[in-house]
């Protein structure tokens, strides 16, 4: 199952990001056998076959984050609204096994979700959480505006 794990980047022992199956197809049986028990789509869930996920036994949730780059009006609120639910899903499932968060490219929306989890669940600071994600995924927050936008959202989240 090493081939499946090489597409994952872990921010903790049990929480990882990945690009979506619409970009690099995944083998769900291999992900399951490597200990993944939950999958979270933070994009539109393109190419995710929910019935197959459920049949294998994965916990699955679809909580979209804004995909605009450059950022548009309303994106801040969309992300601030979705992130507490994203963090809750990760926290509820990380005790059962590995949790994989994905969008399409696995860098901006996924990076924001993982940084928010580190911020609220692990007590990281805003810059520390962004750095931790970039340490394992150097192209994180590289879409137009997503560097300052991620920081702005995390600051907003840290005040909730």
Residues covered by each model-derived region:
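Cys-dependent protein tyrosine phosphatase-like superfamily
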Residues: 1-100, 105, 112-160
